[in-house]
């Protein structure tokens, strides 16, 4: 597998090939996932919950993210590395530029930020200075207190139409990738069809251009709860690398997510 870039992912969308993405937080797992052929690794601020034992992603700092990005970078040869910008690390453009620089210097090839069209100026500023951006709509975990919990988003028509408009605006601002989380499958399909850039779904149906899972869910090592949109691939294989290879295959062939993983 050749080195994956943002251009590679766009080419996959144009060819109708599915993109497989997973989270990782250290060199050892990153190396296994890279060798398995995963297209992109996200160093997610989900580390606050799955590594640190927090009840949300809000306590995660930019220093945490830079540390884990450096760790992942050491294990990766070909996979695209995306790093989350944590809560309040991009509250204004100046702050966003400084913190994105930390993550890029730590080894990221792209940064991910959560939010709608209000981020247009920030995204443009980052892209103009050479920082590729992955946007994130739907259930954005950094806004959990606004949503009143981890809930499916975009179920009523007004909010669905707003999300489509936001997605188009984020693409126009320069975002090169879009994560869609916990939205009805029909909305995931509509947004994907409306955009030129690839969409990566997590609980967003099977018609997005790719899928992403938190590694702890995909490997069945989540402590207390398996999300509806996830599947334990390790249970089917008994081997971590084979589990990720199965995940990639199931996404590629359109078998994952199945109907049982989809929100209506």
Swiss-Prot record:
Provide the binding site for 3-methyl-2-oxobutanoate.
45-46, 84, 112
What's any GO biological process attached to this entry? pantothenate biosynthetic process
What do the Gene Ontology cellular component annotations say? cytoplasm
Task: Cite the cofactor comment.
Answer: Binds 1 Mg(2+) ion per subunit.
**Which Cys pairs are S-S linked?**
none
Q: What binding partners and quaternary form does the record give?
A: Homodecamer; pentamer of dimers.
Q: What is this protein called?
A: 3-methyl-2-oxobutanoate hydroxymethyltransferase
User: From which source organism is this entry?
Assistant: Colwellia psychrerythraea (strain 34H / ATCC BAA-681)
